[in-house]
């Protein structure tokens, strides 16, 4: 009776595992063949796997498909393992590059050390160096970035100064003779006193208007007949009565 109970318990324990294997295999086969001309029915496949149905055509097809897919899955797993190993080795190789000098120093001093106190002091110094290593790397990158930013700022400031301060030759090319005829107004404010300011203003007026001020004389007196006549002759080409020929006047009267 004891042996029969043990066999029954073993069968009950094995049955769920075999059922789970059949279900997983048949479901995988059904997924792979669902777009094909003859898809595998997962229910019939699982029953044939458990030897509940005969003949086991669906299960045999599924076994052939699983045997074909097994090497492919193994190859993909191998590729994933290699990629994961490479991804893990990359940071380790970078760490070895930075830690190489410290490790060499440790190997050299290992043969020279004789007391455990020296070994502990060396290990502490090595740990401190390793802790400060990421900070140094961050500071180096930050200093490089700051240097690039300062260079860019300097270039921008130099460009701004060049644009604000133009060469006089460039001004002459751009404006031509305009600067020679009409000088800058800053010369009007150059004098310190009132007299200097008036003098500078007169000079600017003479430079700006040229002979116009010499041709039109502002100090003509109208009470003088000679000057009045000369002014009319110069400006309006009018001849005064005193300068006309009297005979011409009489001739006009006789003609009327």
From Swiss-Prot:
<dbReference type="GO" id="GO:0030425">
    <property type="term" value="C:dendrite"/>
</dbReference>
<keyword id="KW-0555">Opioid peptide</keyword>
<keyword id="KW-0964">Secreted</keyword>
<dbReference type="Pfam" id="PF01160">
    <property type="entry name" value="Opiods_neuropep"/>
</dbReference>
<dbReference type="GO" id="GO:0007268">
    <property type="term" value="P:chemical synaptic transmission"/>
</dbReference>
<keyword id="KW-0165">Cleavage on pair of basic residues</keyword>
<comment type="similarity">
    <text>Belongs to the opioid neuropeptide precursor family.</text>
</comment>
<dbReference type="GO" id="GO:0005886">
    <property type="term" value="C:plasma membrane"/>
</dbReference>
<keyword id="KW-1015">Disulfide bond</keyword>
<keyword id="KW-0529">Neurotransmitter</keyword>
<keyword id="KW-0527">Neuropeptide</keyword>
<comment type="function">
    <text>Leu-enkephalins compete with and mimic the effects of opiate drugs. They play a role in a number of physiologic functions, including pain perception and responses to stress.</text>
</comment>
<feature type="signal peptide">
    <location>
        <begin position="1"/>
        <end position="20"/>
    </location>
</feature>
<protein>
    <recommendedName>
        <fullName>Proenkephalin-B</fullName>
    </recommendedName>
</protein>
<dbReference type="InterPro" id="IPR000750">
    <property type="entry name" value="Proenkphlin_B"/>
</dbReference>
<feature type="propeptide">
    <location>
        <begin position="21"/>
        <end position="172"/>
    </location>
</feature>
<dbReference type="GO" id="GO:0005576">
    <property type="term" value="C:extracellular region"/>
</dbReference>
<feature type="propeptide">
    <location>
        <begin position="186"/>
        <end position="206"/>
    </location>
</feature>
<keyword id="KW-0257">Endorphin</keyword>
<comment type="function">
    <text>Dynorphin peptides differentially regulate the kappa opioid receptor. Dynorphin A(1-13) has a typical opioid activity, it is 700 times more potent than Leu-enkephalin.</text>
</comment>
<dbReference type="GO" id="GO:0007218">
    <property type="term" value="P:neuropeptide signaling pathway"/>
</dbReference>
<dbReference type="InterPro" id="IPR006024">
    <property type="entry name" value="Opioid_neupept"/>
</dbReference>
<dbReference type="GO" id="GO:0043679">
    <property type="term" value="C:axon terminus"/>
</dbReference>
<dbReference type="GO" id="GO:0043025">
    <property type="term" value="C:neuronal cell body"/>
</dbReference>
<dbReference type="GO" id="GO:0007600">
    <property type="term" value="P:sensory perception"/>
</dbReference>
<dbReference type="GO" id="GO:0001515">
    <property type="term" value="F:opioid peptide activity"/>
</dbReference>
<keyword id="KW-0732">Signal</keyword>
């Amino acid at each position: 009776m004891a042996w029969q109970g043990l066999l029954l318990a073993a069968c009950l324990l094995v049955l769920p595992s075999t059922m789970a294997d059949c279900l997983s295999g048949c479901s995988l086969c059904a997924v792979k063949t669902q777009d094909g001309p003859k898809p595998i029915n997962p229910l019939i496949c699982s029953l044939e796997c458990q030897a509940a149905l005969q003949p086991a055509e669906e299960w045999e097809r599924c076994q052939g498909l699983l045997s074909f897919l097994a090497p492919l899955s193994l190859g993909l797993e191998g590729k994933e393992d290699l990629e994961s190993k490479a991804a893990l080795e990359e940071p380790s190789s970078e760490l070895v590059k930075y830690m190489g000098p410290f490790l060499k120093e440790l190997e050299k001093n290992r043969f020279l050390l004789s007391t455990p106190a020296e070994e502990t002091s060396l290990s502490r110094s090595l740990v401190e160096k390793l802790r400060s290593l990421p900070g140094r790397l961050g500071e180096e990158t930050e200093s490089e970035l700051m240097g690039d930013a300062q260079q860019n700022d300097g270039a921008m400031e130099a460009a701004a100064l060049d644009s604000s301060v133009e060469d006089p030759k460039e001004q002459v090319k751009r404006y031509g003779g305009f600067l020679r005829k009409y000088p800058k107004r800053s010369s009007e404010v150059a004098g310190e006193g009132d007299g200097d300011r008036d003098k500078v203003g007169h000079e600017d007026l003479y430079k700006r208007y040229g002979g116009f001020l010499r041709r039109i004389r502002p100090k003509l007196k109208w009470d003088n007949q000679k000057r009045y006549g000369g002014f009319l002759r110069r400006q309006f080409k009018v001849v005064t009565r005193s300068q006309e020929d009297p005979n011409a006047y009489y001739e006009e009267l006789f003609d009327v």
